[in-house]
Amino acid sequence: MAYPFQLGLXDATSPIMEELLHFHDHTLMIVFLISSLVLYIITLMLTTKLTHTSTMDAQEVETVWTILPAIILILIALPSLRILYMMDEINNPSLTVKTMGHQWYWSYEYTDYEDLNFDSYMIPTQELKPGELRLLEVDNRVVLPMEMTVRMLISSEDVLHSWAVPSLGLKTDAIPGRLNQTTLMAMRPGLYYGQCSEICGSNHSFMPIVLEMVPLSYFETWSAVMV
């Protein structure tokens, strides 16, 4: 998870987030090279006193600076499109969880079970135990099996919300009257934190999300107790 004064991104926990990190590094390198070239050209223009008074046109240079940006844009667009299609692909999810946003809490329903649903509220600061995180802990965590594809159906009861868990590369808008879906798969067990990422009112900052990814056997035990 994130920590104070962190310079980089959070560690990837899902295949999608790993792809996003690679794409970030790929794009950042291209931007760095372009910025360095532009800075070098500006430095040359400011330091040299020579001028090409006899040069009226440069067809070759114009051709290069037309084709080269097009190639660069293609190099950025192709990996981006690949990840977009990967994020939209849903193949035989093992579990479906319906998530509803409210002012200002989340409710969850495990649709594969008859009566497995609960609300998830933030734990107030004065009720936190030692070691728990301020503004990030909830009274009911979303327990999910690791290394399995889980489909999240996301909507809202009132205003716009956004269900986001950065370490899993997830951010899906919760829109009233509309059902959005996304998939997640965690490669390792642990607690993964997120927050509502759409300003939704005065208590927008107090809508944390906590996913507890556990082995399948633990999930089956938990679901049997909850039902």
UniProtKB/Swiss-Prot annotation:
PANTHER family: CYTOCHROME C OXIDASE SUBUNIT 2 (PTHR22888:SF9), CYTOCHROME C OXIDASE, SUBUNIT II (PTHR22888). It is an enzyme of class 7 (translocase). The chain crosses the membrane at residues 15-45, 60-87. This is Cytochrome c oxidase subunit 2. One of its GO terms (biological process) is ATP synthesis coupled electron transport. Component of the cytochrome c oxidase (complex IV, CIV), a multisubunit enzyme composed of 14 subunits. The complex is composed of a catalytic core of 3 subunits MT-CO1, MT-CO2 and MT-CO3, encoded in the mitochondrial DNA, and 11 supernumerary subunits COX4I, COX5A, COX5B, COX6A, COX6B, COX6C, COX7A, COX7B, COX7C, COX8 and NDUFA4, which are encoded in the nuclear genome. It is found in: Mitochondrion inner membrane. Its EC number is 7.1.1.9. One of its GO terms (cellular component) is mitochondrial inner membrane. Binds a dinuclear copper A center per subunit. Cu cation A1 binds at H161, C196, C200, M207. The keyword Translocase applies. The lineage of its organism: Eukaryota, Metazoa, Chordata, Craniata, Vertebrata. It comes from the Eukaryota. It comes from Vulpes corsac. Component of the cytochrome c oxidase, the last enzyme in the mitochondrial electron transport chain which drives oxidative phosphorylation. The respiratory chain contains 3 multisubunit complexes succinate dehydrogenase (complex II, CII), ubiquinol-cytochrome c oxidoreductase (cytochrome b-c1 complex, complex III, CIII) and cytochrome c oxidase (complex IV, CIV), that cooperate to transfer electrons derived from NADH and succinate to molecular oxygen, creating an electrochemical gradient over the inner membrane that drives transmembrane transport and the ATP synthase. Mg(2+) binds at E198. Belongs to the cytochrome c oxidase subunit 2 family. One of its GO terms (molecular function) is copper ion binding. Its main location: mitochondrion. Residues 1-14, 88-227 are mitochondrial intermembrane. It catalyses: 4 Fe(II)-[cytochrome c] + O2 + 8 H(+)(in) = 4 Fe(III)-[cytochrome c] + 2 H2O + 4 H(+)(out). InterPro entries: CcO_II, CcO_II-like_C, CcO_II_C, Copper_CuA, Cupredoxin, Cyt_c_oxidase_su2, Cyt_c_oxidase_su2_TM_dom, Cyt_c_oxidase_su2_TM_sf. Keywords: Copper, Electron transport, Magnesium, Membrane, Metal-binding, Mitochondrion, Mitochondrion inner membrane, Phosphoprotein, Respiratory chain, Translocase, Transmembrane, Transmembrane helix, Transport. It is a multi-pass membrane protein. CDD domains: CcO_II_C (cd13912). Cu cation A2 binds at C196, E198, C200, H204. Residues 46-59 are mitochondrial matrix.
